[in-house]
């Protein structure tokens, strides 16, 4: 998780980051680099500007960073290009090994670095809170954080009040790529966390063997009411083809009520695999519509 600010004086913000370090960040840093596109987006939503970011800031988030240095792919950013941008503050991912490996080099060079880990709306809200402390733009925390939370709370309350029976809250979450289809549990994925937050029962949480080996027999036995699929990778059509192949190769899957009755949902990658950030309420709204579909 992302620690809340512990204390701050007039010029700095002190907080515990996602890898357990106490960091002291100067307010309003002049040259900021984000090692993930989603974190670049959060920093800009907090009123900040960027001197460098990973490629997905442009490709997946469509951010306008004309003067910023493109440091390469999110999983393998170039340390050389990052340093060439002369950052005084680097926003890094605790769950990306290459980012964590850069820590010692950045610290040795006197470059402030803070690590974040965002898998849920609450994680996003905590990160935005810290970033708006650093930019001194708490108005943007209200606008891009608390206002979104109010919308999400309303959607969750509406779902809870609809008294969906337990068997209709049973879900299977699949992640499809061009070369595989895997079941995912509630933790560690955007859609998994959202389904859990809405009060759904993910069959992979109680049957962990599903996570290691996609057992068609277990899926048939559990009979999920909804099946949600998120695609990953750049080739969405190839990922969808992987899913189609799985169903063709395992005809028993076609006998599931969820498949027969239109409750197999292929979800938008932008809103349910990447981090939706300011669009999180939109994601919850779409999910609500799917979950209440008979």
Where is each model-derived feature located?
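A local structural motif
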Residues: 23-28, 62-70, 198-208
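A short, structured surface patch at a secondary-structure boundary
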Residues: 35-85, 89-96
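Bacterial Sec-exported substrate-binding components of ABC uptake systems
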Residues: 1-38, 138-174, 231, 289-294
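Structured C-terminal subdomain patch of bacterial secreted/periplasmic proteins
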Residues: 125-133, 139-142, 229-294
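Proline-aspartate-enriched helix->loop->beta-strand connector
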Residues: 79-92, 111, 216-229
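Short helix-initiation/N-cap motifs at beta->coil->alpha
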Residues: 17-20, 68-80, 207-216
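Alpha-helical, coiled-coil/dimerization segments enriched in small aliphatic residues
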Residues: 57-59, 182-212
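Extracytoplasmic ligand-binding site segments that recognize negatively charged/polar headgroups
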Residues: 98-101, 117-130, 169-190
């Amino acid at each position: 998780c992302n620690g809340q600010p512990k204390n701050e004086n007039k010029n700095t913000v002190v907080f515990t980051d996602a890898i357990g370090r106490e960091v002291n960040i100067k307010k309003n840093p002049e040259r900021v680099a984000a090692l993930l596109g989603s974190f670049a987006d959060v920093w800009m939503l907090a009123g900040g500007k960027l001197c460098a970011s990973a490629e997905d800031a442009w490709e997946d988030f469509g951010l306008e960073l004309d003067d910023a240095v493109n440091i390469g792919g999110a999983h393998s950013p170039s340390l050389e290009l990052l340093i060439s941008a002369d950052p005084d503050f680097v926003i890094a991912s605790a769950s990306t090994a290459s980012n964590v490996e850069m820590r010692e080099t950045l610290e040795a060079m006197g470059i402030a670095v803070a690590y974040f880990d965002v898998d849920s709306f609450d994680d996003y809200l905590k990160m935005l809170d810290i970033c708006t402390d650093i930019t001194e733009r708490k108005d943007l925390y209200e606008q891009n954080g608390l206002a979104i939370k109010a919308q999400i709370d309303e959607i969750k309350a509406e779902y809870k009040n609809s008294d969906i029976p337990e068997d209709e809250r049973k879900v299977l979450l699949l992640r499809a790529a061009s070369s595989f289809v895997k079941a995912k549990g509630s933790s560690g994925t955007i859609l998994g966390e959202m389904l859990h937050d809405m009060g759904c029962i993910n069959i992979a949480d109680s049957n962990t063997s599903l996570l290691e080996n996609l057992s068609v027999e277990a899926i048939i036995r559990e009979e999920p009411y909804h099946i949600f699929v998120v695609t990953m990778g750049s080739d969405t059509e190839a990922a969808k083809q992987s899913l189609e192949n799985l169903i063709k190769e395992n005809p028993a899957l076609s006998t599931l009520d969820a498949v027969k009755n239109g409750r197999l949902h292929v979800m938008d990658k932008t809103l349910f695999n990447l981090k939706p950030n300011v669009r999180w309420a939109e994601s919850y709204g779409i999910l609500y519509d799917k979950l209440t579909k008979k």
